[in-house]
C-alpha cells in the first residue's frame, strides 16, 4: 500500500472511531435521568476489561462509588444494577421487565435453541418441571435416588484421599442422571463416561462465556457443545424407544420430550442435564466443606444422623422423604451454604422504560440483581460472611420456608422449577456420605472464585480430603 493509501486508511479509521464516540456520547446525553454510568474510552468495549477481571468485586465497588442503582456499559450492552432491597420487588414483578427476553440469547448461544423454539416451549417446559419436581411428588424419586447414591458411594472403597469437589462430582453425577434420565440413557458407567465427562466439564466450565460470546472465539468450548448436542440426538431416540405407557413410570426426560413434542428435543435435553448438575453439585461441595471444617457443626450433624439411622455407619440405609424431615440441622447447613455461595447475578430485560426511584431505565437495558451481595445484607444476615447454620432455625424449615432476604431460587413467574428436588438430592447425598465416612480436611476450605456471575460460585482452589469408613 502506498503512502496516500495509508493516509486514507488512517483518516477513514479515525473518522469511524470519532463517529462511534459521538454516537455513544449522544446516546448518553439523551437520558438525563439515567443512573450513574460506568463506561470506558472505547464505546463498544466500555468497562468490559475492568468488569471482567473480578465481576463480583466490581459490582460492590461500583455500588459504593455510584450508589444503589448504576449502569455498566460492557461488550455493547447496558447492565443496570439494583442493589437495595426496596427495589427488588420491581425487579421481580414489574410488567416492564421480561425474564424470557433476558435469557433467550444465552439459550441460543449455549444450546442452539432459536427464539421461535424458545418462545414456543419455554413456559410449558418450566411449568411441567415445576409440577413434576414439586414437593408433593418428591417421594416418587426418593427410593431410586437413594439406591443410586449407594451404588456410586461403593466405588469410593473403605478409605481414600481425593479432592472434595471431584469426589462429589463423580459420586453424584451418575446417580442423579440415572434418576432423572433413566438408567442406560446417558453415559454413566465407568467404561463409557470418560469422553462424555471431558466434554461436559468443558461445556460447564465455559458456559458463562459461551452464553455471551460468539462460538468462533471459544473453539474448544464450541467443539464440546456440538459433540454433546450430537450425543443427545441418540439419547432422545433411546428415551423415546423406552418410553412406558404409564405416566408415573416415565422419567423426567420422557416427560420433557412429551412436552416438547418434537421441538428442539436434543437441545432442551442438554440444557436439562446442565441444569441438573451445574448448581446442585457445587452447593453439595460447599455444604460438605463447611460442615467438615467446623468441629461443632460436624459433631452436631453426626449426632443428628445417628439419632435417625443409629450409630452403625457401615449399615446400608434407604433414605425416605420422612427421614430427611428428621434432619433439620443438615438442611440448615445446606441453606446457609446456598446463601454464602449464591449466583453472582440474575437478570431481566427492560422492555418498556422503567422508573426506579428518580431514575429512568431505558428499554433494552439488562436489569441486574446480585444475589451474592443481597445475601450479605446485615439487616437479614448478621455476620454475613460467617457460616452460621443456626440462623436458619428462625425459618419454618418443616414448612419449606426461607429467611427474609433469601432469594437464591429467584422470584416472580419463573422461579427455579427444580428447587425442591435440588434441596432433597443435596440433603440425601450429604446424609449418606457423612453417615458412611469420616472426613478430615487436608486443605483449608478455598475461597470462592470472583470470576463467576452465572450460577453457584465455584471454588478458587483445591480442597483435598481424607476419608475412611465409619
Identify the function of each model-found stretch.
Residues 2-115, 405:
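N-terminal membrane-proximal hinge/A-helix region immediately C-terminal to the signal-anchor transmembrane segment
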Residues 394-426, 451-453:
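Cytochrome P450 heme-thiolate "Cys pocket" and heme-binding signature region
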Residues 369-397:
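Conserved cytochrome P450 K-helix/beta-meander segment immediately N-terminal to the heme-binding cysteine loop
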Amino acid at each position: 500500500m502506498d503512502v496516500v493509501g495509508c493516509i486514507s486508511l488512517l483518516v477513514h479509521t479515525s473518522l469511524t472511531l470519532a463517529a462511534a464516540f459521538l454516537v455513544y456520547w449522544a446516546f448518553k446525553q439523551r437520558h438525563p435521568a439515567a443512573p450513574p454510568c460506568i463506561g470506558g474510552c472505547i464505546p463498544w468495549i466500555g468497562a468490559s476489561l475492568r468488569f471482567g477481571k473480578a465481576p463480583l468485586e466490581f459490582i460492590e465497588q461500583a455500588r459504593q462509588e455510584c450508589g444503589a442503582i448504576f449502569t455498566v456499559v460492557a461488550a455493547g450492552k447496558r447492565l443496570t444494577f439494583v442493589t437495595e432491597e426496596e427495589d427488588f420487588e420491581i425487579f421481580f414483578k414489574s410488567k416492564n421487565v421480561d425474564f424470557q427476553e433476558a435469557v433467550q440469547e444465552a439459550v441460543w448461544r449455549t444450546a442452539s435453541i432459536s427464539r421461535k423454539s424458545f418462545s414456543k416451549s419455554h413456559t410449558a417446559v418450566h411449568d411441567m418441571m415445576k409440577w413434576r419436581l414439586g414437593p408433593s411428588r418428591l417421594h416418587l424419586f426418593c427410593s431410586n435416588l437413594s439406591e443410586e447414591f449407594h451404588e456410586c458411594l461403593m466405588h469410593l472403597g473403605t478409605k481414600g484421599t481425593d479432592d472434595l469437589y471431584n469426589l462429589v462430582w463423580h459420586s453424584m453425577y451418575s446417580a442423579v442422571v440415572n434418576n432423572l434420565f433413566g438408567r442406560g440413557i446417558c453415559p454413566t458407567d465407568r467404561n463409557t463416561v470418560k469422553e462424555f465427562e471431558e466434554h461436559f466439564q468443558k461445556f460447564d466450565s465455559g458456559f458463562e462465556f459461551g452464553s455471551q460470546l460468539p462460538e468462533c472465539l471459544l473453539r474448544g468450548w464450541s467443539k464440546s457443545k456440538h459433540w454433546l448436542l450430537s450425543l443427545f440426538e441418540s439419547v432422545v431416540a433411546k428415551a423415546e424407544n423406552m418410553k412406558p405407557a404409564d405416566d408415573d413410570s416415565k422419567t423426567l426426560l420422557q416427560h420433557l420430550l412429551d412436552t416438547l413434542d418434537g421441538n428442539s428435543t436434543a437441545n432442551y435435553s442438554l440444557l436439562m442435564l446442565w441444569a441438573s448438575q451445574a448448581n446442585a453439585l457445587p452447593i453439595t461441595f460447599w455444604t460438605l466443606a463447611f460442615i467438615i471444617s467446623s468441629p461443632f457443626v460436624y459433631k452436631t450433624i453426626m449426632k443428628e444422623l445417628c439419632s435417625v439411622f443409629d450409630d452403625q455407619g457401615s449399615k446400608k440405609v434407604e433414605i425416605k422423604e420422612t427421614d430427611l424431615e428428621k434432619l433439620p440441622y443438615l438442611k440448615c447447613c445446606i441453606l446457609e451454604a446456598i446463601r454464602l455461595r449464591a449466583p453472582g447475578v440474575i437478570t431481566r430485560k427492560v422492555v418498556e422504560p422503567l422508573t426506579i426511584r428518580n431514575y429512568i431505565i431505558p428499554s433494552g437495558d439488562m436489569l441486574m440483581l446480585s444475589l451474592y451481595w443481597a445475601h450479605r445484607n446485615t439487616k437479614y444476615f448478621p455476620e454475613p460472611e460467617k457460616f452460621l447454620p443456626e440462623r436458619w432455625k428462625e425459618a419454618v424449615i418443616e414448612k419449606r420456608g426461607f429467611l427474609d432476604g433469601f432469594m437464591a431460587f429467584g422470584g416472580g413467574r419463573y422461579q427455579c422449577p427444580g428447587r425442591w428436588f435440588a434441596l432433597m438430592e443435596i440433603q440425601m447425598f450429604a446424609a449418606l456420605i457423612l453417615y458412611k465416612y469420616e472426613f478430615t480436611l487436608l486443605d483449608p476450605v478455598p475461597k470462592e472464585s470472583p470470576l463467576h456471575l452465572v450460577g453457584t460460585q465455584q471454588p478458587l482452589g483445591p480442597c483435598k480430603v481424607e476419608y475412611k469408613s465409619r
